[in-house]
A protein has these predicted regions:
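Structured catalytic-domain cores with a bias toward divalent-metal coordination
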Residues: 1-104
Length: 104
């Protein structure tokens, strides 16, 4: 679903970012695997790294990996780029020979 402006791709917080990513991946009508890695922490027991795997539709020749950032402010920009990629670019990709792995 295309956002009304590019600004709308930026999440307000971690939870919104996570929910938007998972919902957008779920909406894609293609073969996929959506997963998560739990991140243990002293104070926060609700941290996860979500990931989505889209296998090539035919023979694998290329792998494209897109990450959102490791920590701090770059994660918001990275999450916005991922949402724009999923909603606007992904549907236009010829996926016959490319696997796509997105680490959110």
């Amino acid at each position: 679903m295309k956002q009304s402006s590019d600004h709308d791709y930026f999440p307000q917080n971690y939870q919104q970012s996570r929910e938007s990513f998972r919902a957008s991946v779920d909406l894609l009508k293609t073969q996929k695997s959506l997963g998560q890695w739990a991140i243990p922490g002293k104070n926060d027991h609700d941290l996860f790294v979500d990931h989505a795997w889209f296998p090539p539709l035919e023979k694998a020749e290329t792998l494209f990996v897109l990450t959102s950032g490791i920590h701090g402010s770059e994660t918001y920009a990275g999450a916005a780029i991922q949402m724009m990629f999923i909603n606007e670019i992904f549907p236009k990709i010829d996926r016959r020979h490319i696997g796509i792995f997105i680490v959110h």
